[in-house]
Amino acid sequence: MWVLEEGLTSLSNVSRIGVLQPNDGDILEQIIDKGAKIIKDAPDSLPFIKKYADVRVVRRFLKGVISGEFEDFIILVFYNKEKALSGASLVSRGRPWYAPEGVTFLNEECSVAFQKGLGLSRAMAYVLEKRAGIDVKLLAFSNANTLNNKMLENTFEKHLGYSSYKTFYKEI
């Protein structure tokens, strides 16, 4: 694992954030096993995610991410102060179709937290802002868990200065 940030911040109880590397398959398997259970079993996960999420497809894709097959994605991992794996996030990097060359966005595609109240979103926002690089013009975060709406709104809008834009969806 390549360590991005180490040490507690005033924003959260995350003590280490890293990027999974090709030799981190054992950590990836823990994330997949715990994450699949959370996403599939949590009563407040969005219905279409519960319905269509396929662990085999997810495993194959995430293995491709850490092997470098999908260069526009990284997997961030989060550890608490006891050094226990506490969550993970799939982050994409790319240029939106409407932006000129040289404009890059970072987007949280999916996150799973194995420990409530850790401040994973705040820690991720902090480290991505700090390490984004000169070409990154926008950070975007998502939420697929309706239970966390108010908490994430509080985190991103009130504490971190983000704006929100609702996404509408309909299963057809």
Residue ranges and their predicted role:
Residues 4-38:
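A short beta-loop-alpha structural element at the N-terminal edge
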Residues 40-63:
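Conserved GNAT-fold acetyl-CoA-binding loop/helix
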Residues 117-130:
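Conserved acetyl-CoA-binding loop-helix of GNAT-fold acetyltransferases
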Residues 60-77:
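A short helix-loop-beta-strand connector motif used in the catalytic cores of GNAT acetyltransferases and
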